[in-house]
């Protein structure tokens, strides 16, 4: 089985180019089903979740091709409405095909989706939106089936600002006759990016990025060429790597305005920054000071997906701080792995209390989810000796060439094949 061997890193130095946002490209790939002509997506990360999403498109009769950092999708031959269970189980974002298929085919069927084991993440809010638009929704065992002869615009009030439910409501609303208003919508930049793509294809959407999104549906969409937003979580990962190990890194083709929460926390820790409209330079040459307590919140608050890497960056910081998770109840599964390295932390329900340790030591670690896996890599880069990290597939779900990028700036890590024990 593949594993990462990670040794203590020297000071990091160099440049890293940030890829397109995982959390943008997945709903946008699903949205291509709404188009009647081909689409081209630039800055498309080459990650496992994109591979799985393209496989779903292929299973529905669509064609796609990758050329470098661009993906070409031809949805004209879309014929199916059911997503194969093995593909649905591969990632959470498979649920986004419900809204797109309902709008295009009038019918959608999906086994309950998979993804990272960081919490329940029910699709109840998604189904509420479909029902409001006039769809008949049935749930049997582990399968969801949606059907609508005609979708009609409506007011949808989400119980909470769910990113996935907002995206699914937008996708379905594009195919609904009339005006749909989504109240209590999520405000994340990836919502704005999805709206940008749909607008480029001819959709009429207002308010994306606010708590009230309006969609005037029923118009046919044509394919467009679109560039995916930079990944703010990948940005956070490299910023935290430099904070943890010290040195100077320049991140290119990123979006500093979307990284403000992580920049603020790392500034508190003693890091220095210089930013342009699409670059961030981070330097850390003095002691790392524990940042103020962090609480994950919906945008524009601190992103839950960036909390694991920030926590990992603080393992040897001077002082103590707290990390409170309010989005996913099982987010801190990686904390017990960090303890193997000698991290001085204690979990109290949804809060981790952390005191900086004078030294960390190599251990055998197991990644169980995407962001927790990235945290283990950053932690192992600070530990004396050579750590072994299993569960590499989780990291590959959301990072494009993470290993090579870290190697290029001085980190000592490599993927090896370790035989399974009989």
Segments from the language model and where they lie:
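Short, structured segments at the rim of ligand-binding sites
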Residues: 1-422
